[in-house]
Swiss-Prot record:
Family label: Belongs to the peroxiredoxin family. AhpC/Prx1 subfamily.
Protein name from the UniProt record: Alkyl hydroperoxide reductase C
Record organism: Staphylococcus haemolyticus (strain JCSC1435)
A Gene Ontology BP annotation from the UniProt entry: cell redox homeostasis
Catalytic center residues: 49 (cysteine sulfenic acid (-soh) intermediate)
Top-rank EC class of the record's enzyme: oxidoreductase
Taxonomic lineage from the root: Bacteria, Bacillati, Bacillota, Bacilli, Bacillales
């Protein structure tokens, strides 16, 4: 089921906040009011996951400059996130909140639960300030994601929101031309 253009479902969960070195409660309301990225991954203390989360951290300042809140989610507890943060060179760099979803509520809400394994799939969601999903990417376990591509998708989503009636073509980058769909473009692209 596609979540594109659908509002996120309610949830309440515990997260580890590395910036403050504390546990905190988060809900769907924390993903509203500004742009948000939710990055699901299978498990702490694993292999591809730390490379993805470190890559996401490497883009964190750019995401903050774009006004984007970043959250990672796995079916581990927030306690395990803290332990991983304290023991992994890659994960110790993370500044964004790490949500624990042992009940699998959020993972199910975003339709990324691998039922057989009981783990989250590799899913990334861009959520607008209204709490509506604007983009989604889901990869197989062995395929890591590229956070620089994510940054460009966010820029495109923000551009389209700020410029109604315009769309971003393939390979669009900030500053390049957008399209205005209409009869004058039919068959000319």
């Amino acid at each position: 089921m596609s979540l594109i253009n659908k509002e996120i479902l309610p949830f309440i969960a515990q997260a580890y906040d590395p910036k403050k070195d504390e546990f905190k409660e988060v809900s769907q309301d924390d993903l509203k009011g500004s742009w948000s990225v939710v990055c699901f991954y299978p498990a702490d203390f694993s292999f591809v996951c730390p490379t993805e989360l470190e890559d996401l951290q490497n883009q964190y300042d750019k995401l903050q400059d774009l006004g984007v809140n970043v959250f990672s989610v796995s079916t581990d507890t927030h306690f395990v996130h803290k332990a991983w943060h304290d023991h992994s060179d890659a994960i110790s760099k993370i500044q964004y909140q790490m949500i624990g979803d042992p009940s699998q509520t959020i993972t199910r809400n975003f339709d990324v639960l691998d039922e057989e394994a009981g783990l989250a799939q590799r899913g990334t969601f861009i959520i607008d300030p209204d709490g509506v999903v604007q983009a989604a990417e889901i990869n197989a376990d062995g395929i890591g994601r590229d956070a620089s591509t994510l940054v460009n998708k966010i820029k495109a989503a923000q551009y389209v929101r700020q410029h109604p009636g315009e769309v971003c073509p393939a390979k669009w980058e900030e500053g390049s031309e957008s399209l205005q769909p209409g009869l004058d473009l039919v068959g000319k692209i």
